[in-house]
Amino acid sequence: MMNRKLSTLMFAAAALLASCSQSDELQNTVNDNEGLKPVTISVAMPTEGMTTRATNASGDEEVTRCLIQILDENSQPLEGYETPATMDGTEAGGFTKTVTLNPTKTHRILFWADRGADYYTTANGLNQVTMADNLLTPDIAYTASTTWGGTQTSAAITAELQHAVSKITLHTTTTVSPGKTLSIHVPTTYTGFNVNYGQPINQTSNGSTCSKTLQAAVPTNSNVFSFYVLADGEENQILTLTNDGAETEIENVPVKPDTHIILQGDVQYAGYTQVTFTAKIDTEWGSTETETIKN
């Protein structure tokens, strides 16, 4: 009988200790979360990009993911964001995520949107986004960043993405015969992007070249092909168009992020006769407002 009472007392004491332990843990969690504020973060695609895709068959590809990473006041990843997190949503409807942040501290919030890990690697964080090893030129990608904390502590944050890449389109003013091999070389390009600083990283040794062999004729006043590059826009570049081995240089082209460059001219005879190419710079990527630079 004594043993049974002793066992009962021991069980009750153990239950009381467990209850106290759980209460302490709960109180610690409350204390840890004291002062944190829930914040809903929304990211929208650039509206001009959506317009381009809706009206142009050769528009940009649709992104399939948007990543977020939050940095502390020392530019180090916040706990839980050592690697970028995936936001909910789609390109058409935008992306969202709700987080809890300390309003007394300043946070740097980084965003990166692309078509997935087959195109860009983000394992080292959004300060070191890199192209996939098998790519010769980068794929479509968007970026944004914002600061939250201090005097900016709203319960909702909205950011609009911009293109991290520059898009280059070759446009012909004459019919181009099938079978031609065309290429465009950009001498100064990069293979990565630092979202926090908003600039490309890891310069290539020989630039980037995109080549295409035409399977069919390209009609007059049509786009021949497009591709993307990561470039810093620090200085204008001389691009080289090669037409079945014959070269044409296109000078004074400002290749930089969030800019669509349209190289326009007689592609059929480029490099074989004197051909003038015009570089039309679409700074809003899809708008009708362009800056024209003649070669």
Question: Model-derived features: where do they sit?
Answer:
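Sec-type signal peptide cleavage vicinity
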Residues: 2-8, 17-295
